A protein has these predicted regions:
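Cleavable N-terminal signal peptides
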Residues: 15-16, 27
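Conserved, well-structured beta-alpha core segment at the onset of a catalytic domain
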Residues: 2-5, 23-27
Length: 300
């Protein structure tokens, strides 16, 4: 016999799923500001990224595995279409981050910006470390996307930085086998032409220069959709309890480049392929070229 608590829990779960369905189904009917408010509210309805992902999956009837004949066309070469290097494209240049940070991480951000304003800035990718996810979304390099029924590859030009999204029905690896990874472990499902992704098992990092830190407890939920012939849009919710007071929602977008002559290519390159000396971190927390010299002094 069901207890009152069990029935209440079940009703609450159904209510949240229904609310999720309503919010997601109405987002395209709203102006951008109202849409963002609704999507932020959706994130706050769910305690964890896993909870939001599960609700979206239930709303989609469990999701589906696409056949090769029904795959969306994401071919081409893309670039981030707005936002500069701000993690939230709606953040105006010089304005505070739109993330609601815990006091400790707010202080970290303020120090990072103050240091940068004084010329003291360190970026892990200066020594060719991968940007990692969720920073991956903001990197200003060309991107390419390969979609198959069982997995989707999200490819960033720098060092062939690839996110692998498994859509064959598998779950995340068992908790006992997890450890932090730059791009984490990503599973997903298709809801019509929308790819819904949950990523966990991430390493700590920064969203971008002059942007906040994230911890190795960070997790994300993304909804990718091609909204017209040349635009891929992504709704992103970031959950990171040590750093964020509430989930951070942003909308990312990537524009397909004109390539009528088929000459555009994604090419492997890394930050060591330049004429500069090796970059090192200074004692003061900034960056400097090791043994830096201007030009060839005294050489041929």
């Amino acid at each position: 016999m069901q207890t009152t608590a069990t029935i209440k829990s079940a009703v609450t779960g159904v209510t949240l799923i229904a609310a999720t369905a309503f919010l997601v189904s109405t987002i395209h009917a709203q102006d951008p500001a109202a849409t963002k408010e609704r999507m932020m509210a959706l994130g706050k309805q769910h305690k964890t990224a896993a909870d939001l992902y599960d609700a979206l999956k239930k709303q989609a009837g469990g999701g589906k595995r696409l056949a090769y004949t029904s795959l969306p066309d994401w071919t081409g070469v893309y670039t981030r279409s707005r936002g500069g290097i701000a993690y939230d494209p709606d953040q105006k240049p010089g304005a505070p981050s739109t993330a609601r940070l815990t006091p400790e991480f707010q202080k970290r951000l303020e120090k990072r910006i103050d240091d940068a304003n004084r010329g003291i800035e360190w970026d892990p990718i200066s020594t060719c470390s991968p940007p990692g996810h969720p920073r991956w979304l903001t990197e200003p390099f060309l991107k390419e996307f390969i979609v198959t029924p069982d997995r989707t590859w999200l490819i960033n030009e720098m060092v062939n930085d690839i996110r692998r999204i498994y859509t064959d029905g598998r779950d995340h690896v068992p908790a006992a086998d997890r450890y932090p990874l730059y791009n984490g472990d990503s599973i997903g499902f298709w809801d019509g032409d929308k790819l819904v992704i949950h990523t966990n098992q991430l390493t700590e990092g920064i969203y971008q220069r002059r942007n906040p830190d994230y911890t190795n407890q960070v997790e994300t939920v993304e909804i990718w959709q091609k909204t017209n012939a040349t635009l891929l849009e992504v709704d992103v919710w970031v959950y990171d309890p040590p750093a964020l007071v509430e989930p951070w929602y942003t909308k990312q977008s990537y524009a397909k480049l004109d390539d009528q002559d088929k000459n555009l290519r994604i090419r492997y390159w890394h930050c060591g392929e330049n004429q500069n000396n090796a970059v090192v971190k200074t004692d003061g927390g900034g960056s400097q070229f090791q043994g830096f010299t201007f030009g060839n002094q005294g050489g041929k």
